[in-house]
């Protein structure tokens, strides 16, 4: 009861400012918070597609033509359209996989993928810093799981040996799960080294590339493309919520595996089909990413200037080698709240913070992005 009282007091104090703040205006480098125009550091609109005129036009036309209700029903029953199929074909072709399956949401989609792929006899080996959606998916797994040290290939090899022995005993398989780009630190999963371990161990590899799709690899094809190991990734998951500036996700791989997911993923079997405006909008976003590699090139120009400037000004950005740009500071919740207030009230900068338990105790990460205001950001 005491903990509930503390929680309730915190929620009452924090709501609307530290938690659930309301940003207003067009999505961009400057937005309005509590009536004041601010430089916005808290966006993941990597390629700037959120307000692209062709994207806004496609979204509006999709809504005008079909409304938000169509198609009615789950895809297996009455929610299938030629547009859903077209988007799946184009996504699979773009990332270099045989087939793809659309998902309504990224977070619950990943949970359902893991639930669908595994039996109690199967064994999972996953990175210690895997995203919360992966952890929640593994909570549904009734079999054994092993965690390896973040990006530590010696640790992975050791856990793979344990997993292999157990899987052979149980007559199951081994699934390794990692990320293409880790969203808190910005470092890349060592996909090339993980794929190389297939020479010594039998396992399938599932990669969550939410932050890599559109930003990494040839033309934005993702982190597996960056490492040249697309064929070695068995199950590739991507979301529309980052580079695509939309909603939804997709999973891709060999056709037999995608069909297994298509006919068995509970989050899709028992859910309404992705609404038509989202599908029409995603087709336009993919077209722009595919036909305009300069969007990715511009992103990386900004990233290089931003990260170099931050380091030159004495900020610790860790080991990021992606557009994710964390700034590591020492402190806990009191220091983080003071910093949020200082940035917003005294400097006109809207910024959100990440603290323990999302990151190690005693650290703070301002979640930050900026497109057009690099000098102000670095200062």
Language-model region placement:
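Conserved PLP-anchoring active-site segment centered on the Schiff-base-forming lysine
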Residues: 113-132
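Conserved core segment of the aminotransferase class I/II
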Residues: 235-237, 244-296
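PLP-dependent enzyme catalytic core of the Aspartate aminotransferase-like
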Residues: 53, 57, 61, 65, ...
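Conserved small/polar residues in nucleotide/adenosyl-binding loops
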Residues: 1-9, 370-377
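N-terminal "arm"/small-domain region of PLP-dependent enzymes with the aminotransferase-like
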Residues: 7-69, 203
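Conserved N-terminal alpha-helix of the aminotransferase class I/II PLP-enzyme fold
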Residues: 57, 64-105
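Active-site phosphate-binding strand-loop segment of PLP-dependent enzymes
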Residues: 146, 150-207
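Conserved PLP-binding catalytic core of the aspartate aminotransferase-like
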Residues: 19, 297-307, 311-347, 363
